[in-house]
Amino acid sequence: MSAPALSELQSQLSIEFKDQKLLYEALVHRSYVNEHDEAASHNERLEFLGDAVLELAVTNYLYQNFPLSEGELTLLRSALVKKDNLAAVAKNLRLGDYILLSKGEEKSGGREKNYLLANTFEAVIGAIYLDQGYAASEKMILEFLLPTLDTIIAENLHIDAKSSLQEKAQASVGVTPTYKVIEESGPAHDRLFIMGAYINDELLATGQGSSKQQAEQAAARIALVTKQWP
């Protein structure tokens, strides 16, 4: 990766690395190392470290700012650090433009894969932690990840809607909801699923997402509103 590209990314992150090699390593996917002898290390160790730093920073922020029970705080934290949310932040930062991939991974759309983007975001956090300490990595997390919390709370994305719908349906009509694929489209690396939530043969709602599980949760959230089951 060229020095200008690294400089451009640092400008987007509002940070300047003392050790540029750490940022470079954070962007190296395992597949790239297999094809390039000069890339001695990939980013999985940094991802491991960044995951821990991320969890601490998010946990501390939620504890300090939300007087909620442990269970409620855990739900919010899980929604913040889940792969799809981290991937969305990575896309906003255009991290996919800078990831170093093998030719095969590149062809399969690796730059758009949510899990790969999320892992790279965590690796960058780990690199910042090693280069500049906890305060700098926490600052990045608060600046780029925490703004997603408003949407999570407003849209109840931290709530397990499927469990709530099941409880309400069993209590009201004695039936467990089921889910069916209504439509599946898009390339392998960027699938879109539309799932329907049903009670018996009645379609309550449809929801969409990048995985069946995500689409089912979306359908369940809409079904709860449709049935007026708060």
Model-derived features: where do they sit?
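Double-stranded RNA-binding/processing signature
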Residues: 1-230
